[in-house]
Amino acid sequence: AICNPLLYSVAMSQRLCIQLVVGPYVIGLMNTMTHTTNAFCLPFCGPNVINPFFCDMSPFLSLVCADTRLNKLAVFIVAGAVGVFSGPTILISYIYILMAILRMSADGRCRTFSTCSSHPTAAFISYGTLFFIYVHPSATFSLDLNKVVSVFYTAVIPMLNPFIC
């Protein structure tokens, strides 16, 4: 829409719009089903209590009585795959948008930057906190720190979204 506004209605066919809506849902479902299927195969040692903000895989795995290295590896691989595929896609689109903005007049550039700069800010904050939670070595794992960060990406970022965007 910013790079080629006159071609937008041609490029964004109904089929592409449906794919762009359905695709993330399918990927999210596959991500969730991977973790859910793995969780049902794990042995648990009686009643235990965890202290997370919400039931996430990392604290959940601390309740397991068996070796969880493969499960932690699966969490890391799935989170890494989501980041590897979606991160560069977003980054490349931002580069194209930035190049289109830099070709505009000074007045148009100023208005466009003031309108569009909030989205990359929200995306980078969100991706940063998610990578902090899911893609870090287990040696630096801290449930209390993860709890603070998870509150940030589940409550603070969505609350700030109307103000940012």
Curated annotation (Swiss-Prot):
InterPro entries: GPCR_Rhodpsn_7TM (IPR017452), Olfact_rcpt (IPR000725). GO terms for molecular function: G protein-coupled receptor activity; olfactory receptor activity. Residues 1-15, 65-72, 144-165 are cytoplasmic. It is found in: Cell membrane. Residues 37-43, 94-122 are extracellular. Keywords: Cell membrane, G-protein coupled receptor, Membrane, Olfaction, Receptor, Sensory transduction, Transducer, Transmembrane, Transmembrane helix. One of its GO terms (cellular component) is plasma membrane. The chain crosses the membrane at residues 16-36, 44-64, 73-93, 123-143. It is a multi-pass membrane protein. The keyword Aminoacyl-tRNA synthetase does not apply. Belongs to the G-protein coupled receptor 1 family. Odorant receptor. This is Olfactory receptor-like protein HbA1.
